[in-house]
């Protein structure tokens, strides 16, 4: 182990995006330190001479100060990536206050570069599409989008007023192996548990998980990205096209019928009420309906392609990997 290499601390290292970021960082001449919640999380990684762990929590700034001491860079991936939580305050505790803690700890420990990983949903419903990095945010239909926006804004304010060396990446909807959450609905489609589509003709941008990790690592390794924001992702598909690709790859029947969101709101409200007591995620979170109601979320990601030199994997390849992963784990 070389003590002369710069250390990069990664929050959210055990997550869907975090694990590929660790793999990619270990290809660089850096030391990688994973912020983990408990010692059992170490078992999620293959041992490596340049890999270490520190126990901490983005909601406890004192643990961040310990974790960041002596580090060169920080990648903040930790947060709540969901459209529902039994306690909606968790979105803001993790995505806003947690991110703010990360930025404060970076300043306190003289971190040379911090990359904040965010989402295009932080732009809410912009006045025009496709939007770019300079487009003002519009109203936010989801707690996830608004909480991420608030966290990003906290970082931008510190960048302007306190010289926080910040880069923000807004990742399109991430697809690939290893996603154990239900946000992208791949597993549900494979089970045939989807009676109809919602927002069938709404278009979104998608991003292969290893393209996401490549963008994150390139951003932190280039000092020229400090002070900049990048929208990451290029592959586009309507919801109908998205599930059609899943059906074609997996040879399963997927719905083609669309139900307008306004007819589903009463049912979704009842589901959320039940979920508030059961603690189980509703099949149709209200924030999903509100997000699809706002229409297509299209952005211009050409700046990242140009300045980070990114090329993108096709949506069909990303979905094929996600499907294979889910099918394998269903067998296991």
Stretches with model-predicted labels:
Residues 7-28:
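N-terminal Rossmann NAD(P)H-binding glycine-rich loop of SDR-like oxidoreductase domains
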Residues 40-41, 51-97, 105, 123:
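NAD(P)H-binding glycine-rich loop region in Rossmannoid oxidoreductase-like domains
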Residues 92-99, 115, 147-148, 205:
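Short alpha-helix in the Rossmann-fold core of NAD(P)-dependent oxidoreductases
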Residues 97-143:
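Conserved Rossmann-fold NAD(P)-dependent oxidoreductase catalytic core, especially the SDR/UDP-sugar
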Residues 125-169, 173-174, 195:
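Catalytic helix-loop patch of NAD(P)-dependent Rossmann-fold dehydrogenases
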Residues 165-204, 246:
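NAD(P)-dependent short-chain dehydrogenase/reductase
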Residues 180-184, 198-221, 227-228:
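Substrate-positioning beta->alpha
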Residues 218-283, 301, 306, 315-332:
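Mid/C-terminal beta-alpha module of Rossmann-like enzyme folds, strongest
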């Amino acid at each position: 182990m070389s003590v002369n290499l710069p250390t990069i601390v990664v929050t959210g290292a055990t997550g869907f995006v975090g694990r590929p970021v660790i793999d990619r960082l270990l290809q660089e001449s850096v030391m990688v330190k994973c912020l983990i919640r408990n010692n059992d999380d170490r078992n999620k990684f293959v041992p490596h001479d340049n890999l270490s762990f520190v126990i901490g929590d983005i909601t406890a700034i004192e643990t961040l100060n310990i974790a960041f001491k002596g580090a060169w860079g920080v990648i903040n991936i930790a947060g709540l990536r969901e459209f529902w939580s039994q306690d909606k305050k968790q979105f803001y505790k993790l995505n806003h206050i947690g991110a703010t803690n990360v930025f404060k700890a970076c300043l306190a420990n003289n971190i040379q570069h911090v990359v904040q990983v965010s989402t295009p949903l932080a732009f809410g419903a912009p006045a025009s599409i496709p939007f770019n990095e300079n487009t003002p945010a519009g109203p936010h239909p989801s707690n996830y989008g608004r909480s991420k926006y608030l966290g990003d804004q906290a970082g931008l304010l510190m960048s302007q007023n306190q010289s926080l060396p910040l880069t923000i990446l807004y990742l399109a909807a991430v697809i690939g192996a290893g996603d154990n959450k239900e946000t992208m609905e791949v597993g549900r489609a494979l089970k045939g548990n989807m009676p109809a589509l919602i927002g069938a003709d709404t278009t979104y941008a998608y991003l292969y998980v290893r393209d996401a990790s490549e963008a994150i690592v390139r951003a932190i390794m280039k000092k020229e990205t400090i002070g900049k924001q990048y929208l990451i992702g290029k592959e586009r598909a309507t919801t109908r096209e998205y599930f059609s690709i899943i059906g074609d790859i997996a040879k399963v029947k997927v719905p083609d019928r669309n139900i307008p969101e306004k007819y589903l709101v009463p049912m979704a409200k009842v589901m959320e009420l039940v979920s508030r007591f059961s603690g189980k995620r509703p099949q149709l979170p209200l924030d999903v309906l509100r997000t699809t109601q706002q229409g297509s979320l299209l952005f211009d990601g050409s700046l990242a392609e140009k300045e980070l030199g990114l090329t993108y994997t096709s949506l069909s390849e990303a979905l094929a990997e996600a499907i294979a992963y889910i099918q394998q784990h269903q067998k296991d």
